[in-house]
């Protein structure tokens, strides 16, 4: 299967009958974006969707790039990856850094590779900042100011990183909403840019001169479950991760040096259990730590929903009463329709 039309015929979806339109659409280099909060079912839907559109999946998850971070990121299984090719999973060691710029260039390269084989790239994930980077181009922030950075690092030691995060919320609430109050490196870098340039990170950082992704025609869908269903999914998800051996995974990552990477070690599902293990795994703190894990995950989903709803590109898809197959078919049908 090498074209959208052959996929459409096989599945019974409406396909453009006008050859000129089909030819034009082919050269638009269409990319599918499938976003949603943690626990919304993105991965499951994407695995159903990929065969319908003859697609391959590009992970848009800031933590799934790391080797060994499998259970806590709900990484797609090796068996599923054999059935549906995936990109941007396990691309670096936990001690290596990986940021939005890295993601942009990896994602563009993956899109070019997939399209060169007449397949459809499907970007799937919940990291809003990475979607933004793909759509807007790589950030082009000012050069580092190491003297100012050292001053901010000392401030963080004296005042606490939470105080610096509160300052960032006042100065640039848009950017602050994309990171956590524990992400020391990003908070310090953001304040460094603001103090050095007088400009907000959210407005300054995206003045990019090169954006290869603009050559793609992007069509996006946002999975938006009912909040009660999402909360139920998160409770089940957290329990399942613990049953599958999340604590053992965290222990192995500690041995692999995850603490050397502030982003990876502060990821939800890891930072809570790293702290628990550092304290000697006291039994009386297990339930408290588990509740922190659940609460932090739920708070993050609220940030994700707020982030994605700002973008008109994403068409909201509510799963109420729909099976995974229903949702995948709906997206595929919309993809193949003329318009």
From Swiss-Prot:
Top-level taxon of origin: Bacteria
Protein residues bound to ATP: 36-43
Needed cofactors: Mg(2+)
EC number: 2.5.1.75
Residues where substrate binds: 38-43
Region of interest called Interaction with substrate tRNA, as start-end residue ranges on this chain: 61-64
One GO MF term: ATP binding
Keyword Isomerase recorded: no
UniProt-listed NCBIfam families: miaA
Role this protein plays: Catalyzes the transfer of a dimethylallyl group onto the adenine at position 37 in tRNAs that read codons beginning with uridine, leading to the formation of N6-(dimethylallyl)adenosine (i(6)A).
Family per record: Belongs to the IPP transferase family.
The name this protein goes by in its record: tRNA dimethylallyltransferase
Species in which this protein is naturally found: Chlamydia trachomatis serovar L2 (strain ATCC VR-902B / DSM 19102 / 434/Bu)
Gene it is expressed from: miaA
